């Protein structure tokens, strides 16, 4: 079984904690290997056919700084044949007009480079007005709001991972 590479960017540590929880839900580091994009060469994305991309939305709809620094370098990675799931951290109350935008920006870019998106997540249960991560009434990946709905995070991660396992052949 090939490992899943989980690449995340984090400003305050929240997205790293979410990445660790996702890794644990999959069964640990034998299945999911974690990479902080601040500390790894973007070339490492090439080593995995199955990826999970994690990014918080920062400020007003912006990419987290490490993902922003790597954004143009993504053009040098061929994502054809790669299965990719996304998760994002955001604040649906304070930033209802751009909730999870960073996740949507990364998904759009990587899809344009050949990546196949899996793990779409329902928008029901969230209170936001607009999101670049919304496609056909669903988020492109798991939307986490630790600011306003922390009590739902563990349950959402478990349900999302259960949805992803068949898509990743587990």
UniProtKB/Swiss-Prot annotation:
<dbReference type="InterPro" id="IPR029039">
    <property type="entry name" value="Flavoprotein-like_sf"/>
</dbReference>
<keyword id="KW-0249">Electron transport</keyword>
<protein>
    <recommendedName>
        <fullName>Flavodoxin</fullName>
    </recommendedName>
</protein>
<dbReference type="InterPro" id="IPR010086">
    <property type="entry name" value="Flavodoxin_lc"/>
</dbReference>
<dbReference type="InterPro" id="IPR001226">
    <property type="entry name" value="Flavodoxin_CS"/>
</dbReference>
<dbReference type="GO" id="GO:0009055">
    <property type="term" value="F:electron transfer activity"/>
</dbReference>
<dbReference type="InterPro" id="IPR050619">
    <property type="entry name" value="Flavodoxin"/>
</dbReference>
<keyword id="KW-0285">Flavoprotein</keyword>
<comment type="similarity">
    <text>Belongs to the flavodoxin family.</text>
</comment>
<feature type="domain" description="Flavodoxin-like">
    <location>
        <begin position="4"/>
        <end position="165"/>
    </location>
</feature>
<comment type="function">
    <text>Low-potential electron donor to a number of redox enzymes.</text>
</comment>
<keyword id="KW-0288">FMN</keyword>
<keyword id="KW-0346">Stress response</keyword>
<dbReference type="Pfam" id="PF00258">
    <property type="entry name" value="Flavodoxin_1"/>
</dbReference>
<dbReference type="GO" id="GO:0010181">
    <property type="term" value="F:FMN binding"/>
</dbReference>
<dbReference type="InterPro" id="IPR008254">
    <property type="entry name" value="Flavodoxin/NO_synth"/>
</dbReference>
<keyword id="KW-0813">Transport</keyword>
